[in-house]
């Protein structure tokens, strides 16, 4: 059986690895997952990521901890295959009053909520991270 929501699988793998105190986690790679990982790295939620392999690329995500506890408290899918959620730039919600980040898929790529508001572009709300 094929996987329907690969981004939700990525978030679940990250969540499970952090609960198990893993240093890194391997995820089947795709361009969308790579773009999400770039936003997570830019926002300081992960230490880094690397894509290896040609036929079946694998992305290794290095997780980040602060004083022994995971930096990512919550990572949850917002828009899903059964219920897509689109918002304009002004309607994009703030996560934890600006302390968290909403990852948005726009026509200019996958970016953070702050970058989307600054560029005044809306899009599909992929996930919220705090």
Curated annotation (Swiss-Prot):
One of the Pfam families matching this protein, by short name: Ribosomal_S8
A GO molecular function held by the record: structural constituent of ribosome
PROSITE patterns: RIBOSOMAL_S8
Domain of life: Bacteria
Record carries keyword Aminoacyl-tRNA synthetase: no
GO biological process: translation
Gene3D superfamilies: 3.30.1370.30, 3.30.1490.10
Keywords on record: Ribonucleoprotein, Ribosomal protein, RNA-binding, rRNA-binding
Reported function: One of the primary rRNA binding proteins, it binds directly to 16S rRNA central domain where it helps coordinate assembly of the platform of the 30S subunit.
Similarity comment: family membership: Belongs to the universal ribosomal protein uS8 family.
Subunit description: Part of the 30S ribosomal subunit. Contacts proteins S5 and S12.
The name this protein goes by in its record: Small ribosomal subunit protein uS8
Species: Alcanivorax borkumensis (strain ATCC 700651 / DSM 11573 / NCIMB 13689 / SK2)
Species lineage: Bacteria, Pseudomonadati, Pseudomonadota, Gammaproteobacteria, Oceanospirillales
